């Protein structure tokens, strides 16, 4: 009987410390996540130094808990996977150092994983993916369309020229006085309000697959501040509905254009913003000629489960790292 392949994965690219254990291709035995949101909320965003310190404090306990929950020991493991970019350099280094130490101490190979490949391959938790496919990756740090010809072969075909969509959500949320992170709250408010403000939909009609959200963000902030100066009170629900409608129009337009240029049977939508109910509703209503796969909510945000799922194809291709593996905070798909 063939021995199960067990991969321990570590994710520390931003403000979540996460460790997971994956059995074979897609069975997550554990996915421990230690969130730092409470520590960053008073700053209105992630403070890199604070994030790194928190990772150092909890990484060992997370590894122990992941193994305990999975009911496996270090001796049972096949390999260790770790996010090495993109992300905050200090945060990444904590995870990489822990992964190296654990792998070295237990004589295990080390698998380097691109954080965004992790988001994309989280869809494997839903079903085994058929290639080629197109992916819309939407998060706090990225907004990009990726053509995947086969597992582990990624090509960015369109991306944001300025703000990522999740970043835009957090910035307008801060203006409205909403807690960080603001995406979920804005999504909820949007379902209560009306789309009554006409915000600019940048580049929506241009014949490319590029995104831009800085103009939308500026228009939102100007509208809000002008109303304040006049002593007017605007409805956060209506503002959220109008902002979200604009974002979704842009995302849907570019995704449809990409599907025209890259005829595939599957569209994967992943990243933290993939948890957005408004986005899921628009996808269900408007993308009907290809299969749309969205990871479960627990795998949309940063987590080590997705890193383990992405590590499978890297391991199968024998794409292993040496002990000199370093953090690559600006890592892109093209230079994997």
UniProtKB/Swiss-Prot annotation:
It holds the Pfam family TsaD. Its EC number is 2.3.1.234. Substrate binds at residues 137-141, 170, 183, 187, 276. This is tRNA N6-adenosine threonylcarbamoyltransferase. InterPro entries: ATPase_NBD, Gcp-like_dom, KAE1/TsaD, TsaD. GO terms for cellular component: cytoplasm. Required for the formation of a threonylcarbamoyl group on adenosine at position 37 (t(6)A37) in tRNAs that read codons beginning with adenine. Is involved in the transfer of the threonylcarbamoyl moiety of threonylcarbamoyl-AMP (TC-AMP) to the N6 group of A37, together with TsaE and TsaB. TsaD likely plays a direct catalytic role in this reaction. It is found in: Cytoplasm. It catalyses: L-threonylcarbamoyladenylate + adenosine(37) in tRNA = N(6)-L-threonylcarbamoyladenosine(37) in tRNA + AMP + H(+). One of its GO terms (molecular function) is N(6)-L-threonylcarbamoyladenine synthase activity. Fe cation binds at residues 115, 119, 302. Its cofactor is Fe(2+). Belongs to the KAE1 / TsaD family. One of its GO terms (biological process) is tRNA threonylcarbamoyladenosine modification. Binds 1 Fe(2+) ion per subunit. Keywords: Acyltransferase, Cytoplasm, Iron, Metal-binding, Transferase, tRNA processing. It comes from the Bacteria. Its main location: cytoplasm.
